[in-house]
């Protein structure tokens, strides 16, 4: 991993000005410099940078037309909170209603293409046809790019043939958290464009957010100056700023196709884009976790918050209520703004994606276990991180819309009652690194979920099923007392079984029998938990198990991960696997309508469904090897088939840089999902 010294130091400089009040620490502003400066392109050390930063500007500072600052508007309704008991938001329901005919048409086309022998008029019809959701896990750039490869496999716009082509267009919902939120958010906010365009024109993968202009010192300084000015706009408007503001503005420049990452572009503004107005693609949802001020770790029953184009809120615990997305940032008392005015522009697209990915903040707070006290940067990093932790700046603060709010379930306490702000953190910090939760609510009637798992599990960075185990445990533990509102979940085995049986070496189906789930042995209906299709990251053609904190990729790495994910998702373009996915998609519809299972599907379920077997011995350490060529029609179980590379993922050079920097110990110290 490579992070430029100059970029990192400037990042810390700006963070210091945010963390410390005037008078405690004086850090001069970073100025623009003339392009003809003698320092242009030089790899100067940080002491020179600090001297440069104190100079007078050679040019007038660049201006920003759009402001990052939230502002006041007249509220459209006195009571802004919508109770979850009302079901779906009216706007979301309208979107889904408009999309039903398009989804059914795409599903019919896909199923017909597979040759599955089924009566489509009975299985795919009206609003009771199959509903597909696709969930993209967290995991930094690894998750964004690996998820992008799976996205390509499902997308009919992708230039390479895929037997799964059209499944993206067949989906009703798409969700993402952390690195997966970068994928979902970047696609959605850029008019639901395709991955190839984003990779080539927007993501700028070859350069880190610390130094997006490589070794060009002048441009990097201008970049940080722009970040500083944008955050100052929000701060001067009277709003608390956190490290997430800085992170979000930096991320925006890699994810939003607009000048300086669109400081005035909001997440809710996607409603104005043509794809959204036409309901052409799945409805996007971004996920974050809540953390109370006194908590240092995320409890298993934390409230999971979701961001959609129409609203922000949670279906969980003592809240179960939503505020319109365009009014996020408005402080409410019992659902009403005290001064009859609302905040607008707080739902900045970059800030939302940064909120779902505050894991970056967490790694900074773990630095002190790894940086030596005699290091050049010890004092300055120690000072900023100590202050950030003390002031809860390792989170994303949102003005609290839930003060004095009581739901109809008075037996459950509103945990956010005492606080002026709600603190949100990375959506994977509760161990549920795949955003399945929004797709389990009964109001959305999702029949099947594709879970794209790019999680980094120890020891070698491949997913071991920990995320789906965590979701299963949350459902079993908390659904019974009605503190959460989901339909249940398929039974999921322990991680040892997942590894021992090779369930993480290929796509695996869970919950194939709708009568055998945590919801109990009942006739299958719209309240039955969805069937889960688990797609783990696996080395078909490339070692894609790079660190979560990898900040840049060259073309070889990016293309390698994209291709590997495509091959893993399609099972080497296996048309038989496409038939089995069609079976998974229609299974709940067949069960609900009491239709017989096609013979082809029975064979598929024998091959891909977990049959309830539990491992009785301890699994070996999971360290798969990459295939030098994809020569088989399906992924191996336990060991690779075909011609295998002799290099294991634990030693692969392409995923581990040979040139190490002092900060690498920080990034590698606590490899989270």
UniProtKB/Swiss-Prot annotation:
CDD domains: cPLA2_Fungal_PLB. It holds the Pfam family PLA2_B. It is found in: Secreted. It is an enzyme of class 3 (hydrolase). InterPro entries: Acyl_Trfase/lysoPLipase, LysoPLipase_cat_dom. SUPFAM superfamilies: FabD/lysophospholipase-like. GO terms for molecular function: lysophospholipase activity; phospholipase A2 activity. Residues 74-615 form the PLA2c domain. It catalyses: a 1-acyl-sn-glycero-3-phosphocholine + H2O = sn-glycerol 3-phosphocholine + a fatty acid + H(+). GO terms for cellular component: cytosol; endoplasmic reticulum; external side of plasma membrane; extracellular region; fungal-type cell wall; nucleus. Its EC number is 3.1.1.5. GO terms for biological process: glycerophospholipid catabolic process. Glycans are attached at residues 72, 125, 191, 194, 272, 301, 374, 404, 409, 481, 516, 545, 574. Catalyzes the release of fatty acids from lysophospholipids. Belongs to the lysophospholipase family. This is Probable lysophospholipase 4. It comes from Schizosaccharomyces pombe (strain 972 / ATCC 24843) (Fission yeast).
């Amino acid at each position: 991993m490579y992070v430029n010294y100059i970029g990192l130091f400037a990042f810390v400089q700006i963070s210091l000005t945010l963390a410390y009040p005037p008078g405690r620490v004086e850090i001069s502003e970073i100025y623009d410099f003339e392009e003809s400066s003698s320092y242009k392109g030089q790899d100067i050390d940080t002491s020179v940078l600090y001297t440069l930063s104190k100079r007078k500007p050679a040019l007038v500072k660049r201006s920003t037309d759009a402001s990052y600052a939230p502002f006041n508007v007249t509220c459209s309704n006195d009571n802004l909170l919508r109770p979850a008991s009302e079901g779906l938001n009216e706007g979301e329901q309208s979107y889904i209603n408009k999309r039903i005919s398009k989804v059914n048409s795409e599903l019919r086309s896909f199923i017909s293409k597979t040759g599955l022998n089924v009566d489509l008029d009975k299985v795919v019809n009206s609003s009771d046809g199959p509903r597909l959701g696709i969930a993209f896990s967290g995991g930094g750039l690894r998750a964004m790019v690996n998820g992008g490869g799976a996205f390509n496999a499902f997308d009919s716009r992708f230039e390479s043939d895929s037997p799964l082509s059209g499944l993206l267009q067949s989906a009703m919902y798409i969700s993402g958290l952390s690195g997966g939120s970068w994928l979902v958010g970047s696609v959605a906010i850029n008019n639901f464009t395709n991955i190839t365009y984003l990779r080539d024109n927007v993501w700028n993968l070859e350069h880190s957010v610390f130094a997006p202009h490589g070794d060009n010192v002048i441009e990097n300084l201008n970049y940080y100056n722009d970040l500083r000015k944008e955050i100052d706009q929000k701060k001067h408007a009277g709003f608390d700023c956190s490290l997430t503001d800085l992170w979000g503005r930096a991320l925006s420049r890699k994810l939003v196709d607009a000048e300086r990452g669109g400081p005035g572009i909001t997440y809710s503004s996607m409603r104005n884009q043509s794809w959204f107005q036409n309901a052409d693609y799945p409805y996007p949802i971004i996920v974050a976790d809540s953390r109370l001020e006194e908590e240092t770790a995320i409890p298993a029953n934390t409230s999971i918050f979701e961001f959609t184009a129409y609203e922000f809120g949670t279906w969980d615990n003592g809240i179960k209520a939503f505020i319109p997305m365009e009014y996020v940032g408005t402080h409410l008392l019992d659902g009403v703004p005290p001064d009859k005015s609302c905040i607008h522009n707080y739902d900045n697209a970059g800030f939302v994606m940064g909120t779902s990915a505050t894991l970056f903040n967490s790694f900074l707070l773990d630095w002190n276990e790894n940086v030596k006290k005699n290091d050049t940067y010890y004092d300055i990093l120690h000072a900023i991180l100590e202050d950030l932790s003390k002031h809860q700046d390792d989170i994303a603060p949102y003005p609290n819309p839930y003060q004095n709010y009581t739901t109809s379930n008075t037996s459950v306490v509103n945990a956010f009652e005492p606080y002026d702000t709600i603190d949100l953190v990375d959506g994977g910090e509760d161990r549920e690194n795949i955003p399945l939760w929004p797709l389990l609510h009964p109001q959305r009637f999702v029949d099947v979920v594709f879970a794209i798992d790019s999680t980094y599990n120890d020891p070698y960075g491949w997913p071991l099923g920990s995320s789906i185990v965590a979701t299963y445990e949350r459902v079993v533990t908390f659904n019974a007392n009605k503190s959460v509102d989901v339909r249940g979940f398929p039974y999921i085995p322990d991680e040892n079984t997942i590894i021992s049986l090779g369930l993480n070496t290929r796509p695996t189906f869970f919950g194939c029998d709708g009568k055998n789930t945590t919801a109990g042995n009942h006739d299958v209906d719209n309240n039955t938990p969805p069937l889960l299709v688990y797609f783990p990251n696996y080395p078909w053609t490339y070692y894609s198990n790079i660190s979560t904190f990898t900040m840049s990729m060259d073309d070889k790495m990016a293309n390698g991960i994209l291709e590997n994910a495509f091959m893993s998702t399609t099972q080497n373009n296996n048309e038989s696997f496409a038939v089995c996915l069609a079976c998974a998609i229609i299974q709940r519809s067949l069960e609900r309508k009491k239709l017989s299972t096609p013979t082809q599907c029975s064979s598929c379920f024998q091959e891909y469904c977990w049959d309830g077997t539990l491992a009785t011995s301890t699994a070996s350490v999971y360290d798969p090897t990459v295939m030098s060529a994809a020569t088989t029609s399906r992924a191996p179980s336990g060991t690779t088939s075909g011609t295998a590379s002799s290099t294991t993922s634990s030693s692969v050079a392409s995923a581990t840089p040979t040139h190490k920097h002092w900060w690498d110990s920080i990034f590698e110290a606590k490899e989270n999902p």
